[in-house]
Design a protein with these regions (language model features):
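Active-site environment of non-heme Fe oxygenases that use a 2-His-1-carboxylate facial triad
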Residues: 2-166, 170-206
Length: 206
């Protein structure tokens, strides 16, 4: 599935269907499509035009993040393996629920740790449902954010025209810094994203 990643001038609002990928905002560590039943296993980003300033890509290993959480917040690990509510960004049929429940971490069939990192979608999911975060849930999300904020746990990668970045979407989290575009429309930041799966149906929901 192909998608153009560029700033459209839209602004984020829970339930609106507007995703950070069509804005220029700082996009924290996440796994693409975490709010879907079957997120893609791999994400590819082709750079057509980089930003004038910012838009730096950051990548963090899920195993590294998980180990840091186990070391620093062992009392919260059980909560991270229980479901959270995610905003589905209006990517569903009319009449379907606007939120999706899933744990942030799970063990794959091969024993590896897989993730659904998407803190903004989780906060928006609870807002859409009119539910307040209980103390344990709020503490768990804050703990994950604290790990995201550790620069030594991730790598930074710039983009140049023609470069392609491939990441394992369930084994790594990726992020993007806020960016400023060139004033000329033809020079604005533009990436083309490709989602890939090894299994499941060919449609969006897999």
């Amino acid at each position: 599935m192909l998608f153009d990643v560029r700033d459209t001038g839209a602004r984020l609002k829970p339930g609106s269907g507007i995703r950070p990928t069509v804005t220029n905002v700082d996009l924290r560590f996440h796994n693409d499509n975490s709010y879907n039943e079957t997120p893609p296993e791999f994400v590819c980003l082709l750079c057509l035009h980089p930003a004038m300033q910012g838009g730096i890509s950051q990548v963090m290993s899920v195993a590294t993040a998980h180990a840091a959480l186990e070391q620093r917040h062992p009392e919260l690990m059980a909560r991270l393996y229980r479901p959270f509510w995610y905003d589905r960004h209006a990517e569903h049929q009319p009449g379907e629920p606007t939120t999706f429940a899933a744990p942030m971490f799970e063990r794959g069939a091969d024993g590896t740790t897989k993730a659904r990192l998407a803190l903004s979608e989780i906060h928006a999911g609870y807002e859409l449902r009119g539910e307040r975060l209980d103390n344990e849930t709020a503490a768990a999300l804050a703990a994950v954010q604290s790990v995201f904020d550790q620069p030594e746990l991730h790598v930074e990668l710039g983009f140049a025209p023609g470069q392609i970045q491939y990441v394992n979407n369930r084994a790594t989290g990726h992020a993007r810094t806020e960016f400023t575009d060139f004033p000329e429309p033809e020079r604005k930041r533009h990436l083309v994203r490709l989602w890939l799966r090894d299994a499941g149906r060919r449609g969006y929901r897999g």
